[in-house]
């Protein structure tokens, strides 16, 4: 339980916040850039190097790791997880604990207007196309074409959407 003098958010000094950003309690932001008019729900973590474009909505309990870029107007549902390491290991082949020097961040891009459904997991090294929709609970392992709906584990194209003007 926090006292009135304790912050309910952890926003590191290295965070760049745009105008009109709304951040709910129990968030953890560090080393990221947040564009104008973004809404960040409770219990969200956004790591260093993440770029969140103008007008995005990130729902509660989501994890956005280093290497992720969200373009303008992206919707992230509740409990969405991004992965940035294709082969995560605790130790190297010699048995020594891995350090940051042993790790390679693989970027992920979510393009303008895309929507990611609640409970989805997005593996690294993919692009979610403009206005694409990822169904709730999906596991995205490869690129999602623009203007499509994908769903499932692994996520597959279910439907093409009319192209927006």
Feature-to-residue mapping (PLM):
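C-terminal/domain-terminus segments
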Residues: 126-143, 147-149
